[in-house]
Amino acid sequence: MTQPIVVAALYKFVTLSDYVELREPLLQAMVDNGIKGTLLIADEGINGTVSGSREGIDGLMAWLKSDPRLIDIDHKESYCDEQPFYRTKVKLKKEIVTLGVEGVDPNKSVGTYVEPKDWNDLISDPEVLLIDTRNDYEVSIGTFEGAIDPKTTSFREFPEYIKAHFDPAVHKKVAMFCTGGIRCEKASSYMLGEGFEEVYHLKGGILKYLEEVPEQESHWRGECFVFDNRVTVRHDLTEGDYDQCHACRTPISAEDRASEHYSPGVSCPHCWDSLSEKTRRSAIDRQKQIELAKARNQPHPIGRNYRLPSEA
């Protein structure tokens, strides 16, 4: 029986002053262990999602933990039958998750971590303001009962949203969550700096909650968007029902795929009327290449990760 692919989401806020020099040996460690996916490294830490065999993931994690600064790096695992990534990359960044606010440093100041088993009790408190720190397209697929949707299109918009809608003097308790924990951890650091006193965030993010909390006890509704070819996951981190439009990157449901405006690899109901003719023709050609490669049982370099050029 073919062994499932292990998907590992990992991050750690830690000062990596030599992150530029770290890029090449990290990339080599990924290659040596047969790892696909992308890792981001910056002065503030490391972040990314990778995939590979059981032995490959164990080998990469052992390599990372051989660095004393990363010895306690945590990662969350799930499984899939097909390789969710096609490339192996290590990217140098200013931030491992981009908030765009100078001085925010989770290495120095961060909110209170809440274990998944304790999360339901916290968010059931009527005095707690529950905020989803993810982007609008992620929230539309699933979120926690009673959570506020900031309707942001990028994490950079989060600080302005907080300033415009909430007051530390009024909103005494704030709880936040995101996919794997990294965005809400950084958001908690930002909010503490803005004067909010009681700031909580879900340790391990939604993924850890879906893994550990039984579905019958869950306050989660819907599916959770993930940044790989699975698109979404459900409780127990099994693959969800959504696909993704390669034109606009919007998650698409079975209903979307039944629409007359859906064409695999070309358009969906969310973008069919906004694509230029040039982009549409390019997408049609690309899709033909993918289908031809599939018919020949050959991998195609764009595969499900293909993204059409921006219309901007």
Curated annotation (Swiss-Prot):
SUPFAM superfamilies to which the protein is assigned, alphabetical: Rhodanese/Cell cycle control phosphatase
EC number: 1.14.-.-
Oxidoreductase keyword on record: yes
Protein name, as recorded: tRNA uridine(34) hydroxylase
Keyword tRNA processing among record annotations: yes
GO terms classed as biological process: tRNA modification
PANTHER family tied to this protein: RHODANESE-LIKE DOMAIN-CONTAINING PROTEIN 7-RELATED, THIOSULFATE SULFURTRANSFERASE/RHODANESE-LIKE DOMAIN-CONTAINING PROTEIN 2
Disulfide linkage: none
Keywords associated with the record: Oxidoreductase, tRNA processing
Role description: Catalyzes oxygen-dependent 5-hydroxyuridine (ho5U) modification at position 34 in tRNAs.
Class in the EC hierarchy, top level: oxidoreductase
Organism taxonomic ancestry: Bacteria, Pseudomonadati, Pseudomonadota, Gammaproteobacteria, Pseudomonadales
Active site per the UniProt annotation: C178
Organism: Pseudomonas syringae pv. syringae (strain B728a)
Catalytic reaction(s) noted: uridine(34) in tRNA + AH2 + O2 = 5-hydroxyuridine(34) in tRNA + A + H2O
GO MF annotations, alphabetized: oxidoreductase activity, acting on paired donors, with incorporation or reduction of molecular oxygen
